Amino acid sequence: MFKVINVSDHFIILSDFYQTGGFMELPTIIVNFKLYEQGTGDAALEMAILHEKIAAEMGVSIAIVVNFLDLEAIARRVKIPVFAQGMDPVGYGSHTGSISADMLFEKGAYGVLLNHAERPLEYVMLGECVSRARDAGLFTVVCVDSPEQGEVVKKYNPDMIAVEPPGLIGGDLSVAEADPAMIEKAVSELGRGNVIVGAGIRNGSDVRTSLALGASGVLLASGVVRADDPEMVLRDLAEALKRY
């Protein structure tokens, strides 16, 4: 469904079914809006437009992860990759309250974030979600807590693995500062071009360190969405990304 090509030392991920902008380039910044007040409803749309603006002005790859209720409105409005925050391993049928991959695709999602520490999945369910998402034409980013867990989920062939030590998520110390060796290990074991890192990422220095260690991008949330000045933070992150 997806293929990766190298253009001027950048990786570009192409999809025949890409919904909102044509491609996602690596390295990238992926910002999860979670269920923060600043990242829901009208505020979510404004935040998404800001991300699109910075991506265009600075010529970098930025994607966003939004809640189900905001997804369609945002995907229709912006031309950057829009991810869903999760899904269920089901198709159409008697599945009250469930969200299917086909529904996400129809609402304009580019991809789906799976197995986040705040929304973990059993391995069997995770494998089924990745398979169904792939069949629907969605790009999959699977979160893991370590390179070792990444080795386990790699067999499901997700498009990208996001390594996030749970103890650092939402904290003041980033994975780039606390455990750079873990980033190197993840890239070595899971493959260059397959790994992004997260947990505590909040500034350009974290981005530069992560990319220098071989990561293909960063995943963050509160560092942008809850910042006093999200635009200033995004510009700092994007400036670091431009060097790669």
What are these regions (language model features)?
Residues 111-121, 161-173, 213-233:
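Glycine-rich phosphate-binding active-site loops on the catalytic face of alpha/beta enzymes
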Residues 154-163, 174-193:
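Short loop-to-alpha-helix "cap/lid" segments that border enzyme active sites
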Residues 85-89, 93-95, 122-124, 142-147, ...:
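Glycine-rich beta-to-alpha transition loops that act as phosphate-gripper elements at the mouths
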